[in-house]
């Protein structure tokens, strides 16, 4: 979310990313450095949908900054601004890392992120009224850049045969461009596969084309085994752009994902 915050806020705000892009946001713990950064913050921008529930509430509570408490103008969740996929499932921990309110990994969908940018501009305008025009202009510019790139991304992925993901973390991008999800390496979210489960997945995909994608914090072992079994390309990709990225950096991040999905063609 740091890239989007920079795209909308520009030089009117200093943006600090609390979680490095190569870290699993499901597994982080609150750290003193987070609390220091939050103590003087005017606004927290989170993905939401309970993705950061294991660490962000604790970090905010211990920062002793009432401005950024949930429910205050200084707390903003991207997930609250858009329609989520995978919503409405039972809150049953035996089913793995489930999110009953919806899949939180919406930031790989550039169209939803353009919608979030508009909402973020309004929140920034509320906190910093003199900058309202600038925030809205920047959000519209980001949305326009997404619109300009959509036809090229769509052409690139037309006819893409599909992908196996380690986790359901790129489904927003797949849904946006109609790329089939052929399977997930995890049998349930957050649970690594057994050898038998991996063999069954490979057997069901024999004779098909596709690509295998996984994040830096996910074990490469199972993706590489599946890659050898199916003779498919396997590629490691971060779910987030670099920590210092801005709007163009986010768009380049989507370029990399589109290129990777097209590898299966």
Where are these regions (language model features)?
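Extracytoplasmic metal-acquisition and chelation regions
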Residues: 1-265
